[in-house]
Amino acid sequence: MVVIILARPRAGAKSETTKVRGIEVMIALDVSNSMRASSTDDPNGVSRLQRSKLILEKLINKLGDDKVGLIVFAGNAYTQLPITSDFMSAKMFLSSISTNMVPTQGTAIGAAVNMAMNSFSQNEKSGKAIILITDGENHEDDAVGAAKEAAKKGIQVNVIGMGTGKGSPIPMGGQGNFLKDDNGQVVITKLNEDMAIDIAKAAGGVYVAGNSTDAVNDIDENLKKLAKEDLERIVYTQHDEQFPVFAWIALVLMIVNVFVVERKNKWLSKYNFFTKTVKDDNK
């Protein structure tokens, strides 16, 4: 019985759909090998991917009643999390992202933007935005063209550029072990800032440098320009606690047990807890 009480049994779980006002945001995160490189000029600095995840977590925390989805891409693009109002799940999926998720290397930014466009709801009134976070290197398709298509649909594309113009080597495991080309030279991966800026301009978005302390606030301010519309959100109500019923049953059983034990215990019986003493007038 004690075990049951400690387990805190519950029943009657309910869910209900409520209306909130917000926008829809799809995040497209570059997971190509170049994102393992340092986000700064220091080869041993925080990787571009690690810094990207920190930035995106802060952005998700600012979304309020909005919805968010997550796409990862390298040579191909994949949906990691469909658009949702469950920010806890979004941050959980975000934390698990690595450069090993996409087998085909490359930076298919256009494919990621196109996938993001097709991931939004059919609600034409709600504001929609794509947050693209990449170093922009080795892009393989028409990323600017994809951004222009997004603009035609009223979708804002914001870009966060990771890395620096000077560039950094790509760690391959082990101290000082970096990726080398066919000639044995260390590969230096650089931020393609010009292309990142062109993508943002093509779709009414803003470009921010990932190393900027204002990166999160700049993106957040641009998102606030979008029209908020009624969005459905599923709210799970709290379960009804059932353990008090078992607690009362346990209490009654304990009291009954004490009385029974006292009556049967020879040592206790001499104290006459349950026997009324009758005075003998002849003594």
Language model regions located:
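C-terminal signal-anchor/stop-transfer transmembrane helix together with its immediate cytosolic
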Residues: 1-17, 228-283
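Juxtamembrane amphipathic/hinge helix adjacent to a transmembrane helix
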Residues: 206, 210-243
